A protein has these predicted regions:
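P-loop (Walker A) phosphate-binding loop of NTP-binding proteins
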Residues: 10
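Conserved lysine of the Walker
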Residues: 15
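Hydrophobic positions on the alpha1 helix immediately C-terminal to the Walker A/P-loop
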Residues: 18
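Post-Walker A helix-loop "phosphate-sensing" segment adjacent to the P-loop in P-loop NTPases
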Residues: 24-31
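ATP-dependent NMP and nucleoside kinases share a basic, alpha-helical "lid"
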Residues: 29, 78-142
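ATP-dependent small-molecule kinase phosphotransfer cores
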Residues: 33-98
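Small-molecule kinase domains that catalyze NTP-dependent phosphoryl transfer to phosphate-bearing small molecules
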Residues: 122-190
Length: 190
């Protein structure tokens, strides 16, 4: 059975670290909605910095495309995933293991589940929410960027399978242990 993990959380909560652990331990292929947005902006001359000015640009342009078509970023990432799967299928007949590491909007889960299942059939989906209070105080955020819909909408999504509190007491070993527990519970027999 195919496996697809959605990871959500605020800036600095540890999403990228969690994705890396799933990749390293269980060969999940990471994908990020933000990669395509960053590609568009780099092509347009953005310097790639995620300072306050850069974050505002990411949020504003991302929102502009979502206003044009709510599923714009979902459909683009799905196309990227399909291309990866086509290559994977060509070389092997392994199960598909995907992890999307930067879910910020509800449709990024619901729409992806729908179109993925339509194309690839039965799939085990899980959603992990990372909560990292005060995890990275060096991030440049202001009230506007902190309260942007890209930082707040996902809080309304209630179908979270696992919540990881990634505070000052959690170290990398702890995260590895949590990932192992989740994997064994959700995927060991599939």
């Amino acid at each position: 059975m195919h496996k697809l993990i959605f990871v959500t959380g605020k800036v600095g909560s540890g999403k990228d670290t969690l994705v890396k652990i799933f990749k390293d331990l269980y060969s999940f292929e990471p994908f990020f909605y933000g990669d395509n947005l960053k590609t568009v902006l780099l092509y347009a001359g953005w310097n790639g910095k995620k300072d306050l000015k850069g974050r505002k640009l990411l949020q504003q342009v991302g929102r502009a495309f979502r206003n044009y078509d709510e599923d714009f970023w979902v459909n683009w990432l799905f196309d990227d995933i399909c291309m990866y799967i086509d290559i994977l299928d060509y070389f092997s007949n392994n199960d598909i293991r995907i992890i999307i590491g930067d879910v910020r909007h509800i449709n990024e889960i619901t729409r992806m589940k729908k179109i993925f299942t339509e194309k690839y059939g039965p799939t085990k989906f899980i959603t992990i929410k990372m909560i990292g209070p005060n995890r990275d105080p060096n991030r440049e955020m202001d009230k506007e960027t902190t309260e942007d819909i890209s930082e707040t909408e996902i809080d309304q999504y209630k179908d979270i399978d696992y919540t990881i509190i990634n505070n000052e007491t959690v170290n990398i070993k702890d995260l590895h242990s949590m990932v192992k527990i989740i994997y064994e519970k959700e995927f060991q027999d599939s």
